[in-house]
Amino acid sequence: MVRVKFTAFLVCLLALSCTPKDRYVVFSGYAQGGTYSVKFNMNGRDGMISQDLQEIKDSVDAILTAIDASLSGYNKNSILSRFNAGETVVPDSYFIDIYRSAYDVYNSTGAVVDAASAPLFDVWGFGFKSGEMPSSDKVMEVMSGCGMNRLQADVTMAVSGDGTLNPYDLLRDRNGVPPQLNYNAIAQGYSCDKVARYLYSIGVKDMMVDIGEIFCDGVNPKGMPWGIGIDKPVDGNNDMGAQLQAIFKVPAGPHGVVTSGNYRKFYVKDGRKYAHTIDPRNGYPVSHNLLSATIVAPDALIADAYATYCMVIGLEESVSFIESTPGVEGCLVYDDGGEFKTWTSQGMTLSEL
């Protein structure tokens, strides 16, 4: 699913530490077309973290740079961009790893979150290429070349002995249209998880990683759960945190937190609003009263995927999905006769503003 990523606004500011030994630090930088920030406690699982702050920041920057070089659809020299252009590429560990995750997400969401629908996103103007208002015939034509079900489940089976991957070799039917992939629905969540995994590896236990999506664990500097604000889904609300719908505390333990919505990327044609959330099952932008979906899940990639999933299937199905999925909590903001209303799952406590 192509969509704009909404940073769940960090409400809790770094303040006094929990204990005399705690030392919370923060650094930020640029990645994946935007900014990122990492906040964590230098007092880790086994005492003070041995690496200095600059070394940690350099390692995080290296991870994000490597992911961008592999998976960015906007970087024309990335492995993904060259693959989508029909070139034979040498897939790295990130390319292989996220492909496997995307295939799992495709299956778990019943083909709703489909990384192999990149041409469909492009034709509507919400992908890596410009486009606007395709004809129904064009939509059907483009859909015939989409779908993870056309591709092998294990990308490594398509990699040649010399380590290269030809796009045609990924097809189940090699005579089909070569695939094009778009990981916008999971890439930033995936990046959060990768950075968090690195922080765990050096002993960090209390952290907040924000790369347009959020991963957090442990507690904030006050010894309390991390506080997250949910933006009010007002068209054109691009100033994150300026207009909040509600605030909630993230449950204890490691969690990804992702908000998806249709209020920051859309266009209007002949008086009708076309949102950037596309349903790959029919090829058209969704039209329903669900304005935003905030998902809390065990990791950021899954939260990312499920937030997109909810924005496709709408309010009623999203409620059923969240209530029936173990380890997942959610907050849905919807339009009820011109008023913003919220629904929250049982394990998610909100303070509405």
Locate predicted features.
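Mature catalytic core of soluble alpha/beta enzymes
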Residues: V2-T7, S17-L353
